Amino acid sequence: MPAAASHREQCERNVKAYDTLGGEQAAYFEWPVTTLFYTGVHLAEEYFARLSKPLHSSGHRQRLQCLADRAPEAAMKLAILHNASRLARYDCAFRAFKESDVLRLRDIAAKEIPRALQLDALTM
C-alpha cells in the first residue's frame, strides 16, 4: 500500500500533466478532465493512507463507498469528477465541456476535495 506522501506526489504529477495538456485552455478537454479525476483519486487514497487504520481501495466503486462512509462531501465531489471524466472519454461529450466547466472541475480537485478531507489544497 503506497504511503500518503506517494499519493500526494502523484497528485502533484497529475497537476503538472493537467497544465502540460493545456488545462482549461486545452484543445481537447477530455484529457485535462481525466487528470482532474485521477487527482481526486489520489487525494482520496492519501486520506485513506493517513487514517489510524490505513486502507487502500481496490477500485473506483470501493473507493467511492469507503469515502462516502467517512467523508460524504468528498465522495460527492469525487463522483462529480468521475462522471465528468467518463462523459468526456466514453460518451464523446467532450464538445459539451466549456472552459468554465473545466475551471469548476479544477476547483473541485484542487480545493474542495482537499478541504473536505482536511488535506492541503493543491496549487493549480
Where are these regions (language model features)?
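Terminal alpha-helical segments
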Residues: 1-124
